[in-house]
Regions:
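Conserved ABC ATPase signature
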Residues: 125-129, 133
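A short, proline-enriched helix->beta-strand linker immediately N-terminal to the Walker B motif
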Residues: 144-148
Length: 239
């Protein structure tokens, strides 16, 4: 069954009893979730727990997948994947502008590229960019659409450790500036804590843990890490 998606004037996600299954195997088993406007949320879970399935459902790109429940999402949604998905036969700026209307589109595209640190690379081909630069271009392509909701499916998963650190900082900076709601799917507990204000753990087809990260509160990074690892069944001090 197709998801019931209606456009809202305010950017927020609301899921009620969302189910999705593949070949009779239930992956999402009645997910209830609200994502308030402007919140940065990370989604953790074991491999195969259904994180991408949930993200694709919210993005409205899971046509043909069996399921039920209600889903409300904002009108302007951008999605970033692990690979940049830039069209190799188009230069960087046209990639960013793809499908964008308006007289000021080019100006906005250039500004977005400058914002992600790719000013001056507008005429480069995607293959001339490093992996990190390609992901920067993908972020520019997302942000130029001024999304109310940014869905990111392991956007830094294929990058080296140093580039990943820089890209995390960039994403947080862009979020602070533009304030879309963000749902970041990641395998990386530390990435989730460093970036997000709320961390969810998907478990047995539902949200098993819903943790608020209070940066100004008394809890240190390590405390959140231990709780999240425990929810994921990882006990670091076990032999
Ligand atoms: N199109 C599909 N057809 C059949 N099964 C699918 C399809 N998409 C996902 N699945 C199955 O649904 C389950 C959840 O997949 P999903 O990709 O959502 O998990 P995930 O938590 O994102 O995993 P990972 O962290 O490894 O990317 C998996 O068992 C997967 O094989």
């Amino acid at each position: 069954m197709a998801p019931h998606t209606e456009q809202l004037t305010r950017p927020a996600v609301r899921l009620r009893g969302l189910t999705r299954s593949f070949e009779g195997r239930t992956v999402l088993d009645g997910v209830d979730l609200d994502l308030p406007a402007g919140q940065f949320t990370a989604l953790l879970g074991h491999s195969g727990s259904g994180k991408s399935t949930l993200l694709r459902a919210i993005a409205g790109i899971d046509h043909g997948v069996a399921g039920s429940g209600t889903l409300t999402a904002p009108g302007r949604v951008s999605v970033v994947f692990q690979d940049s998905r830039l069209l190799p036969w188009r230069r960087v700026l046209p990639n960013v502008l793809l499908g964008l209307d308006g007289e000021d589109a080019e100006e906005r595209g250039r500004a977005a590229l400058a914002e992600v640190g790719l000013g001056g690379r507008e005429r480069a081909w995607p293959t001339e960019l490093s992996g990190g630069e390609q992901q920067r271009a993908a972020l520019a392509r997302s942000l130029v659409r001024e999304p109310e909701l940014l869905l990111a499916d392991e956007p830094f998963g294929a990058l080296d450790a140093l580039t990943r650190i820089k890209m995390r900082a960039l994403l947080r900076r862009l979020w602070e500036r533009h304030r879309p709601s963000v749902l970041l799917v990641t395998h990386d507990v530390d990435e989730a804590i460093v970036l997000a204000d709320r961390v969810l753990v998907l478990e047995d087809g539902r949200i098993g843990l819903d943790l608020t990260v209070d940066r100004d509160g008394p809890h240190a990074h390590g405390g959140y890490r231990t709780r999240l690892l425990k929810a994921l069944g990882v006990f670091e001090d076990a032999p």
